């Protein structure tokens, strides 16, 4: 077996590397070339507009494409650029804006992986005769430990917990996992940068990408307002107890858990606890009203060994992440008449619809990824949940 788990020599194994123009994917290409693989680099042009072209911390824009080209020249592999701008707008940017208007907190990186990168680019890699598509994600995959799943691969958290990207890859299907390879899963980021220096890559000191790639300076409301100029509709700011505290200029300017910049002064610390898109109300309350114990899921991608229905029906003990920056915490996957849900044993504050809930076998670097789903709705502590339901049943002021 070679290092990518193929039963052939590296020189007889063709690998397409998804190159964003950053240090991680560049090192992947360099490592595979060094090992003797037949490597092709492909960069997707996803957008190339105005300030985004030269904005530090972006990805897949003009400067990044040029950096990827220079890296490929340095290591001696072919480089191709594919224009996926229309596809990216259709499947990632527009749904992002629509989700925000609906009062959700979307994760466009998951949509990008599942539509553009792991669907379209993966299909292109196969058309080019590649045996695998390699990326610079910090996650591990290896052959399934179960004999009954021989030939399949499983996902695991990476060695560098600070760089763990498994949360954004929970929706990766089994077919995609079997074709993908993640050479950086066993490396710390510091070693990746050291390798880039050693290889003489122009991106060795390049800053990591930050925030959402198509959102300048992380101002989500700006991109939503630009795409949906009529979406910023005014409404009320309402306390959980029913008091109308003020007015707002559009729920797209708020997120669940927000405290600063709410626009009301009451002498008590208030947080955004719910965004009522139907009645255009921003509902606020005390911090304890953010505490979430249960999240209902949609679009679940299950990677466990048991059948999903059987596992949830019995109560499947696992660990869950509802934010990319948190460690997996104890949870139980269950189901009822409404559908699949996850009980968060220790609770979590400020969980919003649209976020992901990724499931794991444990908390360590070798924990297996069981998949997950998008949060459809969450349930708070009983008192806050009852107050919210009563408020949502009451009509908003005209």
UniProtKB/Swiss-Prot annotation:
It catalyses: S-sulfanyl-L-cysteinyl-[protein] + uridine(34) in tRNA + AH2 + ATP = 2-thiouridine(34) in tRNA + L-cysteinyl-[protein] + A + AMP + diphosphate + H(+). It is an enzyme of class 2 (transferase). The keyword RNA-binding applies. It is found in: Cytoplasm. Its EC number is 2.8.1.13. The record marks 137, 355 as: Interaction with tRNA. CDD domains: MnmA_TRMU-like. Disulfide bonds join 112-213. ATP binds at residues 18-25, 44, 136. Belongs to the MnmA/TRMU family. This is tRNA-specific 2-thiouridylase MnmA. It comes from Rhizobium meliloti (strain 1021) (Ensifer meliloti).
